[in-house]
């Protein structure tokens, strides 16, 4: 009799857990340069170091995405292993319709890892494009680029020079520095409601990569930084101010 009673109680608890209301979220991705929407292929921007520049491509990975509620409880996104690839020239990547059944709640923060780590950042993890087009050379760590921003800047002689801001693992004195970093952003009045789809927009300010706490000057670092440890570390440090949620 006692055993049967426990089975009834357990079944009731399981049913209660299964019936908790859930909703969905859609994460959109946008790009600005300070207060203006990013326009590609137009040399109209100036960074804090005084470099005039244009942007031709922006591509990046985020991973380990999670929501945090009022009580500090976290909900880890498992759709696509918590990874999303963004390419400004591929409209389908600028919207992530997350398939997870997310508990109805008020969420105060969203957090994610900029880049990839562990098994997700090993060569061959992504078998198909466009993600596998982000492959990072095995000789300097393998895996994948975390970000590519390609464009041109005008150097001190007034000549338009190409730049490729490519970040990823890079060799250091003890092995490889992964150069990932965690971003945590506050959410204002964001609620997931039952059977509804709540929307967030993750906005990248391209100019912020060059600003704080360190100035990034193309005339100092040049246009190619894949094996430039100092330049990679500057971008990593500056990444804390790059993203906001709208």
Task: Give the residues covered by each predicted segment.
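Positively charged n-region of N-terminal signal peptides that target proteins for export
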Residues: 1-5
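Sec-dependent N-terminal signal peptides
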Residues: 7-10
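C-terminal motif of bacterial Sec signal peptides marking the signal peptidase cleavage site
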Residues: 14-17
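A short, solvent-exposed, low-complexity linear motif enriched for acidic/polar residues
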Residues: 19-246
């Amino acid at each position: 009799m006692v055993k049967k009673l426990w089975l009834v109680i357990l079944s009731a608890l399981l049913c209660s857990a299964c019936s908790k209301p859930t909703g969905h979220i859609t994460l959109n991705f946008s790009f600005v340069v300070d207060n203006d929407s990013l326009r590609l292929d137009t040399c109209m921007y100036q960074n804090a170091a005084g470099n005039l520049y244009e942007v031709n491509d922006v591509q990046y990975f985020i991973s380990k995405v999670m929501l945090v509620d009022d009580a500090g409880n976290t909900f880890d996104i498992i759709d696509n292993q918590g990874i999303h690839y963004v390419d400004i020239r591929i409209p389908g990547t600028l919207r992530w319709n997350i398939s997870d059944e997310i508990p109805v709640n008020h969420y105060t923060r969203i957090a994610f890892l900029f880049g990839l780590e562990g098994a997700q950042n090993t060569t061959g993890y992504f078998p198909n494009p466009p993600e596998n087009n982000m492959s990072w050379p095995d000789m300097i760590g393998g895996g994948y680029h975390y970000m590519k921003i390609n464009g041109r800047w005008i150097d001190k002689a007034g000549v338009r020079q190409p730049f490729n801001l490519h970040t990823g693992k890079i060799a250091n004195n003890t092995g490889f520095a992964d150069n990932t970093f965690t971003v945590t952003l506050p959410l204002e009045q964001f609620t997931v409601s039952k059977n509804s789809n709540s929307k967030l927009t993750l906005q990248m300010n391209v100019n912020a990569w060059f600003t704080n706490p360190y100035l990034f000057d193309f005339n100092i670092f040049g246009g190619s930084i894949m094996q430039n440890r100092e330049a990679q570390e500057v971008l990593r440090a500056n990444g804390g101010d790059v993203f906001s949620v709208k």
